[in-house]
């Protein structure tokens, strides 16, 4: 669904969106937008009135959306042209194709221009199925909240995006080898909720404003070390996994109440708390 159900009622400064293959080069996005357009019989063209365009504030693509236009799975959909909907602040992508509650296939999206196509997005939700790699790359100056859920253990997230305004991140899935530390991607994040099979790839040292951290390791492998020494503003920490003999490094300036809680939980789990 696209957010035209909630029209703003006003007029935008920009002109109407004229539907053509130059503006929307991807055939699946073209057909999707066409369903919202009006037909200009005088010029034999489709267009979306600017008042309706201004009312589009969210964009939701489910698994069935593009498959009804002939997508057979595996392709990377290009969202070029969606930047014309300049008021979109929320984007949800379900990269699965469901029939009768069963996943029948998956699709992906072109990542290198994604944040150019949605230049004002604040909330991003992505759900994927299968062994494909989902990429978050480029730069977003508006993004504030990120949710990525990978249903298949063979899938991975390659996160190299620069999004300095993000405050909340929830990721469930494996990180790809080329992923950057979360502190590079989301340096001002205050809340991180990470569930992954490769917890050693989770580097939060650059998240200096981090207040809430939840780490869950989905394997039964030993966790060597978790470094929280640079996260001096932490107020809440929960770590789940095989913590026996794990070294958890914390700042000497960490909240005293939190330190006491960590001492109890680490002792019970057989982990070691180290202050730096």
Predicted regions and their residues:
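Bacterial N-terminal signal peptides
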Residues: 1-6
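Extracellular beta-rich repeat passengers
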Residues: 208-209, 218-219, 228-233, 250-253, ...
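Predominantly soluble domains enriched in secretory-pathway, periplasmic, or organellar proteins
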Residues: 139, 179, 183-184, 203-205, ...
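Extracellular beta-helix/beta-solenoid repeat scaffolds
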Residues: 90-92, 98-99, 120, 212, ...
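N-terminal capping/linker segments that flank leucine-rich repeat
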Residues: 7-175, 179-187, 193, 247-276
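Leucine-rich repeat domain C-terminal region
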Residues: 226, 235-258
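Tandem repeat domain/solenoid detector
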Residues: 122, 142-144, 165-167, 185-191, ...
């Amino acid at each position: 669904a696209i957010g035209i159900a909630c029209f703003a009622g006003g007029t935008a400064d920009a002109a109407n969106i004229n539907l053509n293959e130059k503006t929307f080069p991807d055939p699946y996005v073209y057909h999707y937008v066409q369903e919202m357009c009006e037909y200009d019989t005088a010029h034999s063209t489709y267009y979306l009135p600017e008042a309706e365009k201004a009312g589009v504030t969210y964009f939701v693509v489910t698994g069935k959306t593009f498959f009804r236009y002939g997508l057979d799975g595996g392709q990377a959909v290009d969202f070029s042209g969606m930047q014309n909907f300049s008021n979109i602040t929320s984007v949800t992508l379900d990269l699965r194709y469901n029939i009768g509650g069963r996943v029948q296939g998956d699709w992906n999206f072109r990542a290198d221009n994604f944040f150019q196509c949605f230049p004002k997005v604040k909330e991003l939700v992505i759900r994927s199925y299968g062994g494909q790699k989902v990429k978050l790359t480029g730069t977003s100056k508006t993004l504030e909240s990120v949710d990525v859920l990978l249903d298949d253990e063979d899938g991975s997230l390659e996160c190299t995006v620069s999004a300095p305004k993000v405050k909340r991140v929830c990721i469930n899935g494996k990180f790809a080898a080329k992923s950057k530390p979360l502190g590079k991607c989301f340096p001002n994040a205050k809340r991180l909720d990470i569930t992954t099979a490769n917890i050693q790839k989770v580097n939060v040292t650059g998240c200096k404003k981090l207040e809430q951290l939840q780490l869950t390791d989905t394997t039964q492998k030993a966790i060597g070390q978790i470094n929280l020494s640079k996260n001096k503003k932490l107020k809440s920490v929960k770590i789940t996994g095989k913590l026996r003999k794990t070294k958890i490094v914390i700042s000497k300036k960490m909240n005293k109440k939190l330190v006491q809680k960590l001492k109890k939980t680490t002792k019970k789990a057989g982990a070691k708390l180290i202050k730096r």
